[in-house]
């Protein structure tokens, strides 16, 4: 409710809501619909990865437009054990198919639990796309990491156990 009030108090949001919905009413549902539409508008189909993938038959084949180091990183992404990055970022656009708890330290954010009211969903969030990730920090649902090195360090040594931690990370 506080977000609804805050947005309604800003003149240009009322104008934008009127353009989008026919009147200036700001509601949770309209905010949700607007955000969902915005996220769907972010399309990346000409990344260096997309271009390389179009040149080969399989994800694990070396991409001709990648350096040796980039191809090595791609193999690690798909095959590193015990858990590869692609275990969670598992679609063609590297978005996860389910919300997950990725073991962030000191995370008090309810995540999906705020919607489902189930304690099994505490700390679970949508797995974001990794397309063009290097050009769009900050990282994690709360923006706590500013570099990809920090993200890698988290997954290497920083995962905090909790009852709802994703099984791929246990």
Q: Where do the PLM segments sit?
A:
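Extracytoplasmic redox metalloprotein regions
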Residues: 1-57, 62-66
């Amino acid at each position: 409710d506080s977000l609804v009030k805050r947005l309604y108090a800003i003149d240009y949001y009322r104008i934008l809501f009127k353009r989008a919905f026919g009147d200036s009413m700001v509601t949770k549902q309209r905010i949700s619909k607007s955000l969902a539409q915005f996220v769907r508008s972010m399309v990346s189909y000409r990344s260096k990865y997309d271009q390389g993938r179009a040149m080969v038959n399989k994800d694990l084949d070396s991409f001709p437009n990648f350096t040796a180091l980039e191809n090595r990183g791609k193999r690690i992404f798909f095959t590193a054990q015990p858990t590869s990055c692609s275990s969670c970022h598992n679609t063609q656009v590297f978005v996860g198919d389910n919300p997950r708890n990725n073991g962030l330290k000191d995370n008090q954010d309810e995540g999906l639990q705020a919607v489902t009211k189930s304690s099994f969903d505490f700390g679970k969030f949508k797995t974001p796309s990794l397309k063009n990730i290097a050009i769009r920090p900050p990282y994690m649902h709360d923006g706590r990491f500013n570099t990809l090195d920090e993200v890698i360090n988290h997954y290497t040594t920083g995962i905090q156990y909790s009852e709802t931690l994703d099984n791929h990370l246990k």
